[in-house]
């Protein structure tokens, strides 16, 4: 049986600027993302392909290109958990979750809409952050390789909500 690893999200913080209007949340960075020190780092994760399609952008390759694309569209990225114990990238194995300070992030931005990329992210947001922010999140399907049953086309359709009514 695989062992729990303690993960502390100090390798990289939220991606945002003062003009961010939308927040997209994962649960906790995967081992590959922690290694890369950036969000959605697993090569089979479809997040960047989905977002490039939704935003009508060229697929970004570098961290700088990904950051620029998100900022250009006023989209912030972060996670619902700042630390936890986890087996690999399995959200189902999460123990001892510690939430991030989303309330503090909201005070520095124009964020009024929040989306969670998967059931775990949504569960932890609604449990720990919603009571403090008062903003209900929208649950989107996970772009993780573990969620391959959801088609790319369906992901794009769901993720279109992120840009609806966004400046």
Language model regions located:
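Short, surface-exposed acidic-centric catalytic microdomains
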Residues: 32-93
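Catalytic metal-binding/acid-base residues of hydrolase active sites
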Residues: 28-29, 120, 144
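Short, hydrophobic/glycine-enriched beta-strand segments
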Residues: 21-27
């Amino acid at each position: 049986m695989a062992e729990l690893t303690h993960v502390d999200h100090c390798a990289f913080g939220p991606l945002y600027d003062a003009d961010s209007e939308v927040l997209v949340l994962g649960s906790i960075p995967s081992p590959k993302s922690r290694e890369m020190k950036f969000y959605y780092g697993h090569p089979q994760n479809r997040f960047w392909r989905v977002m490039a399609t939704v935003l009508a952008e060229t697929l970004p390759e570098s961290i700088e290109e990904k950051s620029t694309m998100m900022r250009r569209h006023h989209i912030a990225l972060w996670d619902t958990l700042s630390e936890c114990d986890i087996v690999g990238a399995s959200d189902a194995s999460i123990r001892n979750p510690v939430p991030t300070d989303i309330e503090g992030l909201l005070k520095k931005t124009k964020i009024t809409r929040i989306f969670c990329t998967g059931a775990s992210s949504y569960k932890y947001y609604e449990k720990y952050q919603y009571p403090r922010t008062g903003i209900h999140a929208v649950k989107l399907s996970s772009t993780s390789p573990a969620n391959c049953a959801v088609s790319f086309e369906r992901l794009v359709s769901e993720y279109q909500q992120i840009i609806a009514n966004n400046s």
